[in-house]
Amino acid sequence: MHFKQSKVLVIFLLILPLILNYSLPTKAASAQTSPALYVGVDVAFESIVETEQLIDNISSYTNFFVIGCTGNYNEDRLTTISQYAYDKGLTFIVYTDLPRYPSKQWLEDAHNNWGDSFLGIYFYDEPGGIQLDQSDYPFVTKADNYSDASNKYVSSLNWWLRSGPDAITKSFGTSKYQLFTSDYSLYWYDYEAGYDTVFAEFAQNYSRQLNIDLCRGAATVQDKDWGVMITNKYDESPYMEARIDLYSDMVLAYDNGAKYIIVFDSDKKWTQNVLTKDHQDAMKQFWEYAQSHPRGISAVSDRSAYVLPKDYAYGFRAPTEDRIWGLWNNDSLTLSVSMSMAALFQIFGNNLDIVYPNELRTVESIGYQNVIYWNDTRILSNLQPIQSPSPIQGLSGEQPTLLALIQQLSYMLFYAIVAVIITAVTVVTIVLKLEKAPAKK
């Protein structure tokens, strides 16, 4: 290689990190997550015949099944469907919201009859969402502050999962059984309460990536598993999203590392299935995609973490219009935290986890490429106030909206990259001119 070319290459290599890296502390490590994949359907309607027909239809392109109880705690029905799923080569779990269903005897028989194909119990649905919306039977209705709410939520839910005399795990005859749930908020605290796996819900028009980042982050820091539950988009027929959207959601979950990808199947009254042939075709198409695009082991060091304030359980369904623990309205931190998250989405894309401080295991020890705390002023220090076309909840029109913030960040990143490229070209040009200049005698 000529000397001139060597100099150009060296200069380019020196400048390249300026283009690729965001100037935050690096925390490199080799922590990794499992590439295993479970794909299936969560059936929440009653009919045994229709359930078996669905299993027949999907068993060639799924490997996982969720058996709902639909309010009818019938162990004979449960045994029949479990055996049918097992005979079709599916792994499966069972939903319940009663600590004594299935019975201890049924669970012992399940281990003997189906071995590792029966993975565990999906106990209680959406505990975090119920808390956030204060719907039927929330775990906390009154608290002195955020930390008090956190302690009460975790201890109350854990009482039903593991520590209380009637806890569901007291019926487990083997430590191999896992505890599952599906939720749309407070994933971090679901894990703290004792769940082994939480499915982040893809529902309505809420941000898929945001829920992935919150659930995956909680699972990663607490060394648990996570997945996605694609549930109803509408409150009435056709209930589920279109085929193309279902396929896209499954691919998104897969590409982000979800271990479980599940499609919910039931109408609002839990009386009949809602998945059409189009939906089943989308699942088959995804199965083929997963077979032709095998995942490697995803290193945590490829991702960055944004650390929220301790016990700041905001719902994040809107930049400033959700609630904290279901007990308080937004506060002075809400807007700045939402803006910081929007900025980091723009910078890191799907390589961002959103987490909380962990007393047992520091976030820095996990192995993230970058760890950014909520009060790191560098995130927003260069943003200027811009006029909002529609001020939110009486906030000043000078406050940036989430959309405007993203647009502004796009311009900033564009101009920064252009500036770096111009600098690189200038430096290379000067070096080349110096090479051509006659040497002084």
Residue locations for each model-derived region?
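Secretory targeting signatures
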Residues: 1-33, 58, 395, 399-441
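Glycan-processing catalytic domains of CAZymes
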Residues: 29-393
